[in-house]
From Swiss-Prot:
Binding site for substrate: H157, E166, E297, D324, S376, H377, R378, S379, K400
Enzyme Commission number(s) of this protein: 4.2.1.11
Active site (UniProt): E209, K349
UniProt keywords, alphabetically: Cytoplasm, Glycolysis, Lyase, Magnesium, Metal-binding
Compartments it resides in: Cytoplasm
Pfam families registered for this protein in UniProt: Enolase_C, Enolase_N
Gene label: ENOL
Catalytic activity: (2R)-2-phosphoglycerate = phosphoenolpyruvate + H2O
Protein name: Enolase
GO biological process, one term: glycolytic process
Amino acid sequence: MSTIKSVFAREILDSRGNPTVEVDLTTEKGLFRSAVPSGASTGIYEACELRDGDKSRYLGKGVLKAVENVNKILAPKLIGLDVTKQGEIDRLMLQIDGTENKTHLGANAILGCSMSVCRAAAAFRGLPLYRYIAELSGNKSPMLPLPCFNVINGGEHAGNKLAMQEFMICPTGATSFHEALRMAAETYHNLKLVIKKRYGMDATNVGDEGGFAPNIQANHEGLELIVEAIKQAGYTGKIEIGMDVAASSFWDAKESKYDLGFKVPADKKTPDMLVSGEGLIKLYEEWTSKYPIWSIEDPFDQDDWATYTRFTELIRNRIQIVGDDLLVTNPKRIVEARNKKACNALLLKLNQIGSVSEAVEACRLAREVNWGVMVSHRSGETEDAFIADLVVGLGCGQIKTGAPCRSERLAKYNQLLRIEEELGANAHYAAKTLSGVGH
């Protein structure tokens, strides 16, 4: 039988020590457990992550309300349903919530159930999770993704003065996933040596996602450090750079400009730290000419559509422009961005939209117009490796899930190694074949 026998949620802690939701679902096949991630820099259009707001517990970040919503509202409705009806179950949960942004039940409550349903259905069908997701999404070619490793952390993810949030290494010259992982790990260790030599041992402390957080202020310094590490590791021309600028986090609405010094003390700020959208475009053009950058995520504020469209028109044939805060994995925002030609790739985050079915639909909409799709973790992660199976099953060809450091990040990379091993001669590695460049 593929019917749900029980559903139970609990409050656990994520990799930042903040509470999150974990859901256990049982069928005759056994117990299926899923844990929900959480972001630090979040887009204003994301689905609602329900927090308790009780300052006496976890500084207001508790999730007992979301847990209660699973145990008292969703569980009674889900028991007895067929786990192989993913779309119907997800739609039912959205119906019960009844809000545009999942503010009633919380996306963290709905997603935990949705992921566990997916796992249970895969077990019922006797399929690995990635195979079942491929079937669910209509994808006939599971594919190992190009991994993008966040090796220097700034922005909301680190206590340094870097405005831009992530500087990533992307092994575009690898021929397999295991080779890509080795290349990245070797470059990561070389980067540690470069940073240690230049800034001292304490500069090699790591941020939320396992990347280094040296106390540098100029964003181009981060790029130069990575270029040096790639060279030292012997991978010049085989590893390129990706960036997550997370520009919404330093958009100054009052000045209608971008504040590159938003983490710098007021008395140390200089006028040139405030730049216009046009100024940022010039900066990115300069960097993409000078450094081996192939992907830039969230280069502008989530509502700065005009600048996105202008930038994409200028540079889409050279690099991938990824929408994260711009799109929030939301089909409506994706359609709007498609119409405005505002970017050429989607960052797909399960908890931004809040259910497996909606994430599958978001991927479909992006691939329909040949956009790249990069599946992503969040800065607050758990040992749950669902997204590793998701990216292979969807066959979208790109993943970012932190540095090759910290167990909650390696849980995903190691699962991808296992999947590659299981596929054997049928394992296909995406490299850059599914990027949004040129679209």
